[in-house]
Amino acid sequence: MRQAGSEPGCATFRGLPALERRLACELAYLQLPAPRWTPVRDYEGRGVDDVAIVGAGMAGLALAAALIQRGIAVVVYDEAPAGAEGPWATTARMETLRSPKQLAGPALGIPSLTFRAWFEAQFGSAAWESLDKIPRLQWMDYLRWYRAVLALPVHNGHCVTDLQPQADGRVELQIEVAGRPMRAWARRVVLATGRAGLGGPAVPAFVASLPRARWAHSSDDDDYGLLAGLRVGVVGAGASAMDSAATALEEGAARVHLLVRRPDIPRVNKGKGATHPGFVQGYARLPDDWKWRIRHYINTQQVPPPRNSTQRVSRHPNAHFHLGVAIESVDERNGALLVRTSTGPIELDFLIVATGFAVDWRQRPMLRHLAPHIRLWKDRYRPPPGADDAELAESPDLGAAFEFQPRAGSHCPGLERVHCFCYPATLSLGVISGDIPAISDGALQLADRLAGLLYVEDIEHQFARIEAFAEPEIFGDEWVAEPLPPLTP
């Protein structure tokens, strides 16, 4: 069998309308989507959706498409305006995606739904061959097309402010729309809220007392043009640190100093050593010791920044890399920031902390009624000496359907009806709930699990459907009944 990516030449469709016709054919060949098979439910005169998804970024769209394929009624809520969901057109600052261009992403196994098909339909196969990596904003254009061509039911400008599971099989969603409250109900709710899905930026203590105008997190939606002429420090050496540093330099910062605690910048992305179907399908089946060992190892090795992102910084003569520099304190002095480090002080005008994200329930008021009851990995597992890891310890201990599970002794009926399809699911179930390489695997797995849960809950209804089914295969006129012949004497 020919390896993926080695094909001599795939068919190129002339324009998006032709591609969309081909996509419609592929879906028809696969008999997708399935007709709805779940019972219609209502509460207080309003419909109860089978599944409500919070977040219309890549993960939310992929899951919505997978659920619709399975004949499940779904609705998606996102607080962002249409076309601005996720980080791609807002807070992300990389020039191109870090993932290889050929990955299928959220295509769910459908060739005409891939980025490559979308790209070649518009620009041709020669342009595809010459493309190195996918431009960030072009990826967002693709996701907008993905949503439109599949007619996914996304409600923008809908900010979910509270989730309250009910004992009768519903989850109540409190939603704010244009400053006005509304309520909705669903049998299951899925959080597709991205990298910061159960919290927000991890903010180091040394900036906590500084005026907010003097520092930013790399995920903030700030105008870097305001950094023109300033001395800027960037804490960290990961991809987001490089993206922030490069953007500051391009916007005219006088100098940018990268302050890196480690004595060297990592060279190898160890996570790429597990990008194969065995890891995707097998990780969730591993015992706790192996899950912790794998994720802790990757955390301690850290992920290097992409080469092109690093060169985007280093090509500027006013970019300075300082390694082995741990920040001890930061104070305002004489209109500037005095940053004391393990190797000496430095004076800056502005500080950007590229310190990632953390599970922090205080930053997710939507989950305030659930957070005290959610079991975490620190409630489940004690790592061996030397393997403590705060990020892993705070991760939720999820079930096979990404569902939250209750802490021992807690009482929150319906908690298991809320599912965590975002980055903090990684320790429990693997890297299948947010990153491009395996997002289709995660979406399809979760859709299958949800379909199974809904069917089991509805077994009385489903059995009644079997009993009521009356479509004949034959009509009785295909034969003539006659008695057995007499025995021969």
Regions found by a protein language model. Give the residues of each.
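Accessible peptide chain termini
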Residues: 1-2, 109
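Flavin (primarily FAD) cofactor-binding/catalytic cores of flavoenzymes
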Residues: 2-80, 85, 128-239, 243-251, ...
